[in-house]
Amino acid sequence: MNTLFGKAKEEAKPITPKSVDEYPEAPVSLGITLVNFTGDWRTFMPVIDESKCVKCYICWKYCPEPAIYIKEDGFVAIDYDYCKGCGICANECPTKAITMVREEK
């Protein structure tokens, strides 16, 4: 979302670092989700119906976290330690093999 208006927008210069060292410090580091587990705040969790799965791996491709992995038999599985419950996997699944169910506490 662009939050600059008027003169500030006209005079703004794009930030295009030439190397990784030129990027400004950020409060989030790369790979942070591999260190921090989801916790108990998730309200919905994906459940996979292997009878509907066609092993297209679209869910794996679109998952924004390292939460979906491919098992030895070729089916996908969910690592609930990393799953945030966003539902992108269920939304993108072409065969609706993934459904979001309310997390039981």
From Swiss-Prot:
Gene3D superfamilies (UniProt xref): 3.30.70.20
Annotated PROSITE patterns: 4FE4S_FER_1, 4FE4S_FER_2
List of residues binding [4Fe-4S] cluster 2: C63, C83, C86, C89
Annotated [4Fe-4S] cluster 1 binding sites: C53, C56, C59, C93
EC number assigned by the record: 1.2.7.7
The reaction(s) this protein catalyses: 3-methyl-2-oxobutanoate + 2 oxidized [2Fe-2S]-[ferredoxin] + CoA = 2-methylpropanoyl-CoA + 2 reduced [2Fe-2S]-[ferredoxin] + CO2 + H(+)
GO molecular function: 3-methyl-2-oxobutanoate dehydrogenase (ferredoxin) activity; 4 iron, 4 sulfur cluster binding; metal ion binding
Quaternary data: Heterotetramer of one alpha, one beta, one delta and one gamma chain.
UniProt protein name: Ketoisovalerate oxidoreductase subunit VorD
The organism's taxonomic lineage, starting at the top: Archaea, Methanobacteriati, Methanobacteriota, Thermococci, Thermococcales
